[in-house]
């Protein structure tokens, strides 16, 4: 009896609220075995066939590809896609995909070469020796995703389960009408499906493994029981046929009695669910080394002559599959991808088959009935009775229609599985699922916008905080700079404090006066001399500053000096190269001396008439002195080369000596009348004084060497002496005036 009760508890199933029993319409396609479809000429492979971001392209236009070759790289939740056959990549461009609005997504377009060559396949028959991480990575890189309709990456799902999974559920319910892809797969490939289940169990290490299958699939149930006859680790649970018992939350409750919490996942209660087709794809990826390049697709509907289930390559155009099955379209033919309750109508037939495509339904005009007009809600609550998620579809309809997003969220519209049971039972023919889909899309867009706004606000606040910190740091630096004195100020303050302390120390010392001693004023005298030296140093700095603004162009002065030196050298060379027999004409020499004296007198008159404010450029004066010296040397050489019989005129010599002395005195007066700030080069002055003294001595020697017979005219000598005395007196007076 206890064993009976234990077996009853072990095989117990639960029932969920709501649900409907629509016509199954499965016998149209589940009676024929799986078959292959001829290769299409062109394949369109969308890069995104799963939940998550698209992968990174690793092929380019013109590349040759083989079947199973990766077209994208998968990182994180990015699942790679693979070439369904061998051929050439002819384009990488947006193309309409399996979507209610046929939205264009980036796709790789391949022209098949007809050879259908595989890449080298490396199967892991000994997968039990592989680590959990290696198996998960292989499943992910081989592109395996949930084939039941969600399209969630299987590797990511297994990784997220971790060690907290106690129950592994294999969903074999396939509850929606018309769809028989999983049914036919279990009938034809039951052993491979079970092998894939064992691989998943090896990765997750669950406490129990449950296969949930509806009782309307007797052939599949028989095949699974035959394969599991010798297995005690996998339990096959047959459940009543009820739509939507194949939903993840509903099947979890049916088999375990546990409910997935609101906003949570099945892994939160220790349950992980995989589809039958996913288990088969895992087996082919791990053991056979084949990426997912094809899947089972149901072709059904009264508009198809040969309904059944086929192996459809991913990327095959829908039109190609339907034509192979004998598609006979009517005038207003409808083609539905998926089932009649959860599927969507295709806007055109050139969309490709993707990983989540499980059925192509082409009903006739009478099969689904005439479309009926939407009417007003009568509040019959039939939708609430049929809802398997225990929601209030009537209220959600009003909130969705009135754009009341907050109230729709409060009434848990996110828990709607969009099964269509409410729309099926609605007597007013209201397309409730369409309203709910639109409302959830709008809420998702609003949340996305709020997320972006929050991120922008966070960035703005971070920027403001950074600017405030920088501003506070600048103010602190300014305050510190204002409080702390500079290095120069510190030195001045220290010197002032030292002087104050010295004065205080001197004030505290007693003054002792001794009789007969003189006061020692050496310190005072030294301080006075120091102040005078400091004043002279400042005056010299000011004079240098003023000289920098008033000096003549140094380049012009240098050029003039260079020209004078060149002329002097030229004259010296000419005189040195002259023949010794050639004699200098004394008359020409006398004329040149007279011209020089006239120029000197003219220069003296111009300088005497000049304004006293005008300053004499010492460099120009030096250049003129150099020119005068050169001319004097020339005259001296000419006189030395003259005939020895010719005697020097003592009167001319006296006049020239007087002129030289007058020029020397005038130069001294000009230097004395210059501004006190202007400094005369002492070396130049010494050179000029030495030259003047040399000229004077030379003239005196010439006078002493003159003939004694020749007498000087006393009147001319008296006149010259009077002129010299007058000039000396005038120079003395001018000097006194300048000193005052």
From Swiss-Prot:
Span list, region Disordered: 602-716
UniProt cross-references to Gene3D superfamilies, sorted A to Z: 3.30.70.20, NADH-ubiquinone oxidoreductase 51kDa subunit
Main location: membrane
Subcellular location: Cell inner membrane
Domain of life, per lineage: Bacteria
Keywords (A to Z) from UniProt: 4Fe-4S, Cell inner membrane, Cell membrane, Electron transport, Iron, Iron-sulfur, Membrane, Metal-binding, Repeat, Translocase, Transport
Domain 4Fe-4S ferredoxin-type: 369-397, 407-436
Keyword check for Translocase: yes
GO CC aspect terms: plasma membrane
Chain sites annotated for binding [4Fe-4S] cluster 1: 377, 380, 383, 426
Cofactor comment: Binds 2 [4Fe-4S] clusters per subunit.
E.C. code: 7.-.-.-
Pfam family membership, one: SLBB
Keyword Transcription: no
Topology term for the membrane: Peripheral membrane protein
UniProt-listed SUPFAM superfamilies: alpha-helical ferredoxin (SSF46548), Nqo1 FMN-binding domain-like (SSF142019)
GO molecular function, one term: metal ion binding
GO terms under biological process: electron transport chain
Amino-acid positions noted as binding [4Fe-4S] cluster 2 in the UniProt annotation, renumbered to this chain: 387, 416, 419, 422
Signal peptide extent: none
Entry function: Part of a membrane-bound complex that couples electron transfer with translocation of ions across the membrane. Required to maintain the reduced state of SoxR.
Homology family: Belongs to the 4Fe4S bacterial-type ferredoxin family. RnfC subfamily.
Matches recorded under PANTHER family: ION-TRANSLOCATING OXIDOREDUCTASE COMPLEX SUBUNIT C
Protein name according to UniProt: Ion-translocating oxidoreductase complex subunit C
Species per Swiss-Prot/TrEMBL record: Escherichia coli O139:H28 (strain E24377A / ETEC)
